[in-house]
Every structure is written in C-alpha cells, then in structure tokens.
From Swiss-Prot:
Family: Belongs to the flavodoxin family.
One Pfam family hit: Flavodoxin_1
Organism: Helicobacter pylori (strain J99 / ATCC 700824) (Campylobacter pylori J99)
Domain (Flavodoxin-like) ranges: 4-160
Keyword Flavoprotein tagged: yes
Intrachain disulfide bonds: none
Record protein name field: Flavodoxin
Length: 164
C-alpha cells in the first residue's frame, strides 16, 4: 500500500483529531493541514483521505474552501479518495455534514470510496447523501462523540482494501 495523504482543515481542532485517529488506524499515512498544503503536495499522492468539517449551515470550512479553489477536477482523476465529513446533526439538521458535498463535487472525478449508511444519525436533510448513503464517513463530535472511534474503525476496515 502506497503512502496515503490525509488532508484536513479545521477551526476547532476536531477535524485534525479525526485525521490523526484515521492515520493511526490505517497506517502508512501523512497528515497534512490544507492551510499549509500546496497543489503539488496534493498531487504527490494517488491515495487521499480528505477530512472536512462543515461550517455553519452547510458551508465548507474556510481553509478547505481556499485549498479546493486551487484544485481542478483533473487533480482528482487518477486518485482513490476517501471523504470524511464532520457536522452537527442537532443544530444543523437540514444541512448536516454538507461540507464534504462541496469536496465531493470535484473529487468524484476520481474513485471515491467509503460511502456509509445514514443509519444511526438523526437529521432532516444533507447534500452529502447520495443514493441513500453518505458520500463518505460522517462524524458528529458535538452529539455522538461516543460513536466516533467505532465509526472510524468500521470505515477504515471498509476502505483499507481500496487503498491497497
């Protein structure tokens, strides 16, 4: 398995903590803050995991917004991509975890892996749901932090083969 680039953007530190947990679980990964990342660095990986919190009512976190603006769909074309979104299903029930939707729109030019069921979450709507599943792993550190480690472990097992 080639080295995996785990890119995150964060305001509160939650996304960085999740990126570190995923790195520990999956192994052979480099964790990179998108606030300090370059397009060249991103393009140095063929396997990436993108960890993005949702800002406000369905927006992409600012560092991610800036970094994503430097990337084209073609930058994702030959990559295997796992998406991890953070959100608050109670406060933002109608736009839950939509931050990863904005990344997914470009990332789907590559091979996106790791879609997960919406079971166990309580929300009204989310653009991050396609075909009845989330486009990646979704974490709610505000309301279901007790499920985070289990969700990460299951997701890593699910995607490990795709990153081999």
């Amino acid at each position: 398995m080639g080295k995996i680039g785990i890119f995150f953007g964060t305001d509160s530190g939650n996304a960085e903590a999740i990126a570190e947990k995923i790195s520990k679980a999956i192994g052979n990964a480099e964790v990179i803050d998108v606030a300090k990342a370059s397009k060249e660095q991103f393009n140095g990986f063929t396997k990436v995991i993108l960890v993005a919190p949702t800002a406000g009512a369905g927006d992409l976190q600012t560092d991610w917004e800036d970094f994503l603006g430097t990337l084209e769909a073609s930058d994702f074309a030959n990559k295997t991509i796992g998406l991890v979104g953070l959100g608050d299903q109670d406060t933002y029930s109608e736009t839950f975890a939509e931050g990863i939707f904005h990344i997914y729109e470009k990332a789907k030019a590559g091979k996106v892996v790791g879609q997960t069921p919406t079971d166990g979450y309580h929300f009204e709507a989310s653009k991050a749901v396609e075909g009845g599943k989330f486009v990646g792993l979704v974490i709610d550190e505000d309301n279901q932090d007790d499920l985070t480690d289990e969700r990460i472990a299951k997701w890593v097992e699910q995607v490990k083969g795709s990153f081999a």
